[in-house]
UniProtKB/Swiss-Prot annotation:
Mg(2+) binds at residues 13, 40. It comes from Rhodopseudomonas palustris (strain HaA2). GO terms for cellular component: cytoplasm. It is an enzyme of class 6 (ligase). Homodimer. This is Adenylosuccinate synthetase.
Length: 430
């Protein structure tokens, strides 16, 4: 399989950034296909820490082409700020190595403000968004009123498109008793941004099709996780886009046959940020210990992540909905030293055992985990780079996960460092 898709197999924050960076050495192109700057990656390369939000991880690899696809929602100011920050760290970013889909939807200040207003209106209705305007921007995209990157190149039609957008947003603001946005101010802002952004604009579907026909390897980089998918996740506590592997095609303009190998990333335990069901959550000393050892705080928001035992039911479900061929298991080292480790192998709902997470919000909140206890290990797995360096019991744990989720482990990560990775099966050669 020439191309590889990387998706999160849990609720995001699984360590996709490191795995994508590690795989990007073998790729010619790294393409983002959904989400926005709400999904943070932390990469450690030769002791230097890089934090990415909107940019594909491929920008850290010289000679690689990074692409932001049409399925992404694109915040111009966040983009420019991230480019500036990484440039100060010595990363070369220019239109030569980064292209942005000309039909990508823009996130504007009015989207961020609306997102925050909704999220802070009531704790009862809060979803746990990052308040960065992601959801409102996707709403405008579906509502056919969004401003897209290509619109900045047509100054004659841009004012009309802004007026159309404000017809909707100012009606909302009047209902909320807020001052209306002025079209002139938005036009001035976008006109000033245009010369900084348009050099990156590209007909991405055509570019990728040409590269594919030339035999170039494409690595599709997903954001967040499959359990946050707007259709297949824990609705309504989800993101506003499709995060499953099939979106790699839609979000870049490629055909489904171009996707290739699907690599699912999951931690050796489970975490979640924000609201929503979490069957294996540990609201106790063990959960806090996992969080502290794993440094479980959001890259973008700094919010502490909720922590719990590995949930084989959920990962098995995402293996199916994403068509995952192999898993990359991360943060195995965080479980070093635990005498016993619990793994969720099923659920109990209203007295009955079930083998999947139900779609209903109420049922999701009522499921109880059924655990299997596995003996832990005392020897360290941290920084291991081969199976021979792993404790026997840690290997048994990995093998049991493979059995429970019905999918082999292709990669094993034992630290944030790029090189601390054990390769079982190369996704590009599978």
């Amino acid at each position: 399989m020439a191309n590889v898709v990387v998706v999160g197999a849990q609720w995001g924050d699984e360590g996709k950034g490191k795995i994508v960076d590690w795989l990007s050495e073998q790729a010619d192109i790294v393409a983002r296909f959904q989400g926005g700057h709400n999904a943070g990656h932390t990469l450690v390369i030769n002791g230097e820490t890089y934090k990415l939000a909107l940019l594909p991880s491929g920008v850290l690899r010289p000679s690689k082409l990074a692409v932001i696809g049409n399925g992404v929602v694109f915040d111009p100011q966040a983009f420019l700020d991230e480019v500036e920050r990484l440039t100060k760290q010595g990363v070369a970013i220019s239109p030569e190595n980064l292209r942005v889909a000309e039909n990508v939807t823009l996130i504007l200040p009015l989207h961020r403000e609306l997102d925050a207003l909704r999220e802070n209106a009531s704790k009862a209705t809060a979803i746990g968004t990052t308040q960065r305007g992601i959801g409102p921007a996707y709403e405008d995209k579906v509502g056919r009123r969004a401003i897209r990157l290509m619109d900045l190149a047509d100054i004659d039609t841009l004012p009309h498109k802004i007026e159309r957008l404000l017809t909707h947003h100012n009606a909302l603001r009047r209902g909320l008793g807020l001052a209306e946005f002025e079209a002139g101010a938005i036009l001035k802002e976008l006109t000033a941004l245009a010369p900084k952004l348009l050099p990156y604009a590209e007909t991405v579907w055509r570019l990728l099709d040409i590269k594919r026909r030339e035999g170039k390897r494409i690595l599709f980089e997903g954001a967040q996780g499959a359990l946050l998918d707007v259709d297949h996740g824990t609705y309504p506590y989800v993101t506003s886009s499709n995060t499953v592997a099939a979106q790699a095609a839609t979000g870049t303009g490629m055909g489904p046959g171009s996707v290739g190998y699907v690599l699912g990333i999951c931690k050796a335990y489970t975490t979640r940020v924000g609201q929503g069901p979490f069957p294996t959550e540990l609201d106790n000393e063990i959960g806090r210990k996992i969080g502290e050892r794993g440094r479980e705080f959001g890259t973008n928001t700094g919010r502490p992540r909720r922590c719990g035992w590995f949930d084989a039911v959920l990962v098995r479900q995402t293996v199916r909905t994403c068509g995952i061929h192999g898993l990359a298991l991360t943060k195995l080292d965080i479980l070093d030293g635990f005498e016993q480790i619990e793994v969720c192998v099923g659920y109990r709902l209203d007295g009955k055992e079930i083998d999947h997470l139900p779609a209903g919000e109420g049922a999701q909140a009522r499921v109880e985990p059924i655990y299997e206890t596995i003996e832990g290990w005392k020897e360290p797995t941290a920084n291991a780079r081969s199976w021979a360096e792993l404790p026997a019991q840690a290997i048994k744990y990995v093998r049991r996960i493979e059995e429970l989720v019905g999918c082999p482990v292709a990669l094993l990560s034992t630290s944030p460092e790029r090189e601390d990775t054990i390769l079982v099966q190369n996704p590009f050669e599978a």
